[in-house]
């Protein structure tokens, strides 16, 4: 009742001030009172206005019951656009003290104060009209800022009331305004904040359907029933270990590819018998199950790995210094023989005995440079035909002797008549005709002038036929010309002597003194 009487007194006082504005004469005169008291009154009213504005801002978004609306009607609303006056000419210290006590009572009400939808004056409307207007006008629902109850406690230290101090003390010192000194208005318990009843706390989530937009008389929608936590099956850690051990024992008898499948099933969460992902499972059992599954997967994959065989040791190959190309006897031979090229030419002929004897004194252990000029090593003009060359030339002679030579069958004619009539000797069958010689020698591709010179050097009979010795010497001169040697002015006698020997018989040479 004391609160109601105080609210009525304040409402009447404000109504009197509003209905009877000050006269023009009183507006020009200075108001009574000291400067410090006016400053304290201004600071107290501004602080009270800020508190009322914050209270109205938070109370706008809440629905109020009829009892709160009736109490709010008894308290005068705070004018928004009305300028604040420092003092009134008829104000007394008792009235100021009453106003300060009324502000203290309004700052700490038993019920939160809500801001009306439209401006109303005290005594203008009744409680029934206010409730009817609240049903007709929709209340806007702006986004409510989320606040953590732990970070913003409801109880905070309140600074001392400056207006009451200024009324009792003659000259108080106004303290500086504090930023965080305003006491937050106690809020009505909302659905997203914990409701404290003794020591029990329950958290109810806020949804759009739970906000009452029509009014306080309509019944609020009922929330869906929450699942009973007793129905959730809690599997103790021991049961998980038993299941994992049984599963690990069964995995040992499977194929090696089965651990991969089991691990993939565990990763995908498709094995409800091992790990229960229900929300009622406590953290200790979940952690034990995860650790046990990881250990089981490690044991499944930790198979004994056979170390790879060591690489074969490389054997050192030793080669002699003097003959690096010859293979050593210590090195192991490969099983497969080295591939050899096919021989498309004639096989290499063996070196003759005479050539070995001829180059016997020229053998050296260290081979010299091939392009260096040495007078003793250069090839000089050969003064004889070798046995090998002579055999080769005689083979050509034997294949072409007696060709295109007419031979008479009459034995009565004497040899002189044959020479005189035909011009061929009696042994013409062992000779080669000039026409056949020209065809054979032309295959050397030497110019005809060179071939003519060779013919003149070997044709000693001048009858158009060449004997065996003449034909062999002519073939030898052609080979010397092809090798780069010049033709001699006259064939030396040593060359004729080398071709006169009997074929197949070798005459040893007598060393000259």
Swiss-Prot record:
One of its GO terms (biological process) is lipid metabolic process. InterPro entries: EF-hand-dom_pair, EH_dom. PROSITE patterns: EH. The keyword Lipid metabolism applies. It holds the Pfam family EH. Keywords: Lipid metabolism. Residues 1-280, 301-360 are annotated as: Disordered. Residues 14-23, 190-200, 237-248 have a biased composition (Basic and acidic residues). It comes from the Eukaryota. CDD domains: EH (cd00052). Residues 88-101 have a biased composition (Polar residues). Residues 314-340 have a biased composition (Low complexity). Residues 412-502 form the EH domain. The keyword Lipid metabolism applies. Belongs to the IRS4 family. Positive regulator of phosphatidylinositol 4,5-bisphosphate turnover and negatively regulates signaling through the cell integrity pathway. Involved in rDNA silencing. This is Increased rDNA silencing protein 4. It comes from Aspergillus fumigatus (strain ATCC MYA-4609 / CBS 101355 / FGSC A1100 / Af293). The gene is irs4.
């Amino acid at each position: 009742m004391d609160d109601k009487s105080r609210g009525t007194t304040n409402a009447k006082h404000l109504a009197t001030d509003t209905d009877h504005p000050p006269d023009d004469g009183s507006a020009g005169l200075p108001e009574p009172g000291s400067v410090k008291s006016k400053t304290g009154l201004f600071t107290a009213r501004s602080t009270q206005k800020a508190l009322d504005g914050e209270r109205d801002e938070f109370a706008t978004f809440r629905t109020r019951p009829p009892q709160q609306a009736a109490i709010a009607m008894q308290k005068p609303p705070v004018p928004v656009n009305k300028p604040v006056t420092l003092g009134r000419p008829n104000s007394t210290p008792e009235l100021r003290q009453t106003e300060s006590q009324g502000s203290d009572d309004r700052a700490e009400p038993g019920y939160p104060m809500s801001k009306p939808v439209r401006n109303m004056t005290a005594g203008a409307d009744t409680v029934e009209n206010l409730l009817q207007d609240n049903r007709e006008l929709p209340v806007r629902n702006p986004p409510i800022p989320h606040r953590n109850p732990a970070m913003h406690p409801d109880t905070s230290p309140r600074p001392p009331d400056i207006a009451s101090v200024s009324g009792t003390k003659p000259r108080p010192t106004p303290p500086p305004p504090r930023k965080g000194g305003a006491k937050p208005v106690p809020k009505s318990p909302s659905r997203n904040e914990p409701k404290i009843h003794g020591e029990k706390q329950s958290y109810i989530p806020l949804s759009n359907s739970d906000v009452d937009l029509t009014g306080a008389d309509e019944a609020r929608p009922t929330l869906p029933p929450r699942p009973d936590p007793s129905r959730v099956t809690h599997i103790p850690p021991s049961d998980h270990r038993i299941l994992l051990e049984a599963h690990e024992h069964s995995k040992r008898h499977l194929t090696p590819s089965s651990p991969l499948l089991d691990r993939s099933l565990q990763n995908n969460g498709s094995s409800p018998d091992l790990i229960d992902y229900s929300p009622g499972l406590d953290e200790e059992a979940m952690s034990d199950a995860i650790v046990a599954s990881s250990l089981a997967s490690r044991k499944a994959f930790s198979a004994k790995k056979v170390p790879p065989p060591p690489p074969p040791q490389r054997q050192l190959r030793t080669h002699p210094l003097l003959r690096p190309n010859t293979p050593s006897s210590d090195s192991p031979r490969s099983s497969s023989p080295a591939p050899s090229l096919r021989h498309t030419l004639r096989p290499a002929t063996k070196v003759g005995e005479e050539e070995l004897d001829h180059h016997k004194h020229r053998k050296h252990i260290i081979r010299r440079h091939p392009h260096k000029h040495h007078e003793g090593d250069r090839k000089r003009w050969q003064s004889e035909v070798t046995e090998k060359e002579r055999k080769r030339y005689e083979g050509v002679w034997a294949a072409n002797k007696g060709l295109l030579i007419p031979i008479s069958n009459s034995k009565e004619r004497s040899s002189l008549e044959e020479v005189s009539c035909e011009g061929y000797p009696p042994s013409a069958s062992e000779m080669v005709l000039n026409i056949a010689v020209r065809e054979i020698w032309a295959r050397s591709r030497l110019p005809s002038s060179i071939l003519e010179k060779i013919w003149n050097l070997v044709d000693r009979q001048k009858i158009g036929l060449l004997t065996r010795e003449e034909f062999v010497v002519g073939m030898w001169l052609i080979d010397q010309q092809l090798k780069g040697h010049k033709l001699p002015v006259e064939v030396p006698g040593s060359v004729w002597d080398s071709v006169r020997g009997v074929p197949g018989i070798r005459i040893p040479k007598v060393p000259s003194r």
